[in-house]
Regions:
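Surface-exposed, charged secondary-structure patches
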Residues: 84-122
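Short beta-strand edge/turn micro-motifs at domain boundaries
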Residues: 124-145
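Core segments of small alpha/beta cavity-forming domains
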Residues: 38-84
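Cysteine-centered loop/knuckle micro-motif
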Residues: 33-35
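Short functional micro-motifs and their immediate structural scaffolds
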Residues: 28-30, 39-40
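Short Cys/His-rich zinc-binding micro-motifs
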Residues: 13-29
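Intrinsically disordered, low-complexity linkers and tails
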Residues: 1-17, 100, 109, 128
Length: 145
């Protein structure tokens, strides 16, 4: 997911994710045991899909620092558009290619469901991930909608 900063919008408090909250990425674990470990720097993504899920959760938690930290330096923007009116609802991973522990690159196709101004929508994207200095990072994406 690659939402870049756009025009200024009214701000709202970030959605509250407690350590015991279900992880936004959709895996059957608490936020603290799943993507929260990556967001806090206590673990690193071992696959491209794990990084994709953690980045989706970072969008849901409005964790701009994590999003920028996991973005390839060649394509990283100065800031990320974290629209306060948008609420991420759920993530569907549609397919993956490579992106495993022994790969140097991989792709993840996914659909991210959201609500904005009381209307539901979905973003379908095919994201590319590469290893940079040994860690998985987001490179770029092709919107599929």
């Amino acid at each position: 997911m690659s939402r870049r900063r756009s025009a200024a919008r009214p701000t709202a408090p970030a959605p509250r994710l407690l350590p015991s909250s279900p992880c936004p990425c959709g895996l059957p674990a608490s936020y603290a045991e799943c993507c929260g470990r990556l967001h806090r720097g206590q673990a690193a993504a071992t696959t491209a899909e794990a990084l994709m899920r953690s980045r989706y959760s970072a969008f849901a938690a409005r964790d701009e620092a994590y999003l920028l930290r996991t973005w390839h330096p060649d394509t990283r923007p100065d800031s990320v558009d974290l629209d306060p009116a948008l609420r991420w609802l759920r993530l569907e991973v549609l397919s993956t290619t490579e992106g495993g522990p022994f790969h140097a690159e991989g792709t993840v196709a996914f659909r991210a469901h959201y609500t904005e101004a009381r209307e539901e929508g979905a973003l379908t994207e095919h994201s590319r991930f590469v290893r940079h200095e040994g860690a998985w990072v987001y490179l770029d994406a092709l919107a599929l909608d």
